[in-house]
Amino acid sequence: MQVVFARGRMESPGVGTLGNAFISALRSKVNKNISVYAVNYPADTEVAQGANDMSHHVQDMVTNCPDTRLVLGGYSLGAAVTDVVLAAPIGAFGFDSPLPAGTDQHIAAVALFGNGSQWVGPITNFSPIYNDRTIELCHGADPICNPADPNTWKANWPQHLAGAYIDAGMANQAADFVAGKL
């Protein structure tokens, strides 16, 4: 089993604070070896770069380790990266590596936190094949994923921080969901 996770905007390389909390929680719930792949991208505004890296890695895993169950996830900008990989059937806007047909059979679950794409609808609207395998979590009045009054963004910004998700038990909630899909 492998978790492929894209960190949030401006987080240091790796899976980020929330990614680490989610993976730790998942490890405590399953009796399996869990490897981790941190999506390699600058985590600034480069969604396409992250999506290409995630997609290339997933395709490589499907080809070279076809029995490995994959869990895809992301926080904030990383959730948008995951959205592109799962929902874009063709290359566009710098994303040039759509997943081939049948790849979905290797993806056990998807965990998204603070997903800005919620403004246009959940990922499952665009890629319904993942409906029963996806958990999308939005913490309270997080202005990134909860369409709220733009005048409240500054006051509500702390709701979007990784620590708020962790403190609210959402890393654990996602781990419970994913563990149930394995």
Regions found by a protein language model. Give the residues of each.
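Hydrophobic/aromatic beta-strand patches that form the interior of the parallel beta-sheet core
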Residues: V4, Y37, A111, R133-C138
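Active-site catalytic motif of lipid deacylating hydrolases and related acyltransferases
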Residues: M1-R69, A141-G180
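Serine-dependent carboxylesterase/thioesterase catalytic core
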Residues: N52-I135, P143-I144
